């Protein structure tokens, strides 16, 4: 159940109760595609850096180790030793972006695994069964992530099919949650809004999925090539359609500036591989923007990555030392920078929640955007 605690303009401060604990929103979900954050970050680390929700990938976990293996191990929470909420995406995005030789039909999608080339079928029922085996807290509906740009006719047909798939997802989840051997009988379902950059299609689809009375809703199909202005325009159009008593998730959008703009438009949930991926390459976020620790100017820099940051890297090591680790190709370099970036994001969300509660989110947003626009 989602409770709206406070609004500051359109920005929402909420609390989402789940079978695996409470999620304070707005929230950034830390992405562990295969049940782990890339960069040697453990579940214990995630708790220490303030992670509330871990996001894993249905497509990848289905391929390895296999969702049946995870079910036999008691579900993903037990498998990865994580007792807080987990959201699994449906696998749709990966099917349409990674998989080879796709064939879309009404029943689902036939594709070849990007790992070993074997032929696989995934449709709404299969996605729900896999996510039920994984036993995540929140399951995402199976949808088609529409390529950008696409013709209006293609988008209309795709959205209509995604709606039919959502109805099948809901029916299958209700069935799975009633079975005696289901691990998480209270698994939640979020529906995904699609429609490309066609505002009227987006709005009509949003109204349709709201009528299905799901546990939450997501805006999908963005951050796939459109401009930031186009993305914000889509959010402006559809966010007001979604109810204030349900969480709203903007999928795959993760620049700090994007997060602030989307929070200002009523979004609650975020995820992105960006902080971990950047960290693995020495690109780290600070209160004054992003820096590249590989740059020569940091060779003798005795300061922490970000002055005042309480992450494990900043509390114990200098920019110069971490740069040395990267140059020496030591794994610790990646680990420290990934931990820092995830801490930065989790702390940003905590500060956003405080700003909404304190009625100063507009000022907070303007200050952050101004600071990030300069050179660190």
From Swiss-Prot:
Q: Which organism is it from?
A: Clostridium tetani (strain Massachusetts / E88)
State if Glycosyltransferase is listed as a keyword: yes
Q: Which Gene3D superfamilies match?
A: Queuine tRNA-ribosyltransferase-like
Q: Which cofactor does it need?
A: Zn(2+)
The entry's protein name is: Queuine tRNA-ribosyltransferase
**EC top class, in one word?**
transferase
The record's catalysed reaction(s) read:
7-aminomethyl-7-carbaguanine + guanosine(34) in tRNA = 7-aminomethyl-7-carbaguanosine(34) in tRNA + guanine
Named in its record, the pathway it takes part in is: tRNA modification; tRNA-queuosine biosynthesis
Q: Which UniProt keywords apply?
A: Glycosyltransferase, Metal-binding, Queuosine biosynthesis, Transferase, tRNA processing, Zinc
Q: Which HAMAP family match?
A: Q_tRNA_Tgt (MF_00168)
Specify which residues bind Zn(2+) according to the UniProt entry for this protein. Answer: 309, 311, 314, 340
> What's a Gene Ontology MF term here?
tRNA-guanosine(34) queuine transglycosylase activity
